[in-house]
Amino acid sequence: NLLIPIAGRGKRFIDAGYKVPKQFIRIGKKQLIDISIDCFDINDCNLIFVVRDDQISNFNIDKMLKLKYGEDITIVVSDGMTDGSVSSCLLAEEHINNNIPLFIHTLDIEFAPVVHPKQICQSDSDGLLLTFKSNSSNYSYALLDGENNVIRTAEKKVISDQACVGIYYFKTGKLFCENAKEMIERNIRTNNEFYISPLYNILIEKNLTIKTKSVEKMHIFGTPKEFEFYKNNVVKKIGDKPIGLCSDHSGVKTKEKFKKILKSQSIDFIDYGTTLDNDCDYKYFIEQAITGKKDG
């Protein structure tokens, strides 16, 4: 099961003047939903989308999703806004196979490497969260013990340096549905909403094992400000091609500093090495380096 709730209103994008649902904002040849879902291997997944009724009447979002992902996907329609991601996901309960694993993908992100769900399903954990390092209170967080087990999660509160990407794994669909209902019955809310990450605290109370898996590269575009930064500083300047670096011996230190900056911004690069020849033809040097990489 791969469950993708996109029933939120996206108020900040509406207020910023965007006319289409944020998942369908386009950057070049791709829409934001493409960028996010491309980070997850959806082959052999039971794809379930949760959308709002007005997204269908105003934007034909159901037809767009079927054009992208096939006629056999499941589209669950909400009559309006829900009380949060957990409530939205529970609308799809009858379509979730209770006996197989469930992944929830909340979009608005680009990360690497690509998630292969079969690999995660081979773990012994009852649940798993993808994480990245951060200290911003905009995100949810997982606190780990000395054996890398999650002992607590929190929404919009920094309790560790392990922020949640927005990919959530439950060992079975039943495990999610039963505990999601309990969360709502106990009225466990953050900012008056039912978020997914605090749901894991209920599983932890029951002595179930929750793990994390870190991603190497992470970009977020869940708010207009984050989207503009992504568009103008990641995609526009770099696109799909990595930066190539090379230097003579006098520029080694500068090159290494630049590599640290690129790494800190999760920007891909290729280090073509260093030449001892001050009069080097760099175009020829890089061509030879590329040829060597292709051959080897």
What are the language-model segments listed below?
Residues F111-N187:
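Conserved core of the sugar-phosphate nucleotidyltransferase
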Residues L2, A163-G239:
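Conserved alpha/beta core of the MobA/IspD/sugar-nucleotide pyrophosphorylase nucleotidyltransferase superfamily
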Residues N1-I4, R12-I14, Y18-K19, I25-R26, ...:
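Conserved N-terminal catalytic core of the sugar/cofactor nucleotidyltransferase
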Residues I6-K11, K241-I261:
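N-terminal beta1-alpha1 ligand-phosphate binding loop
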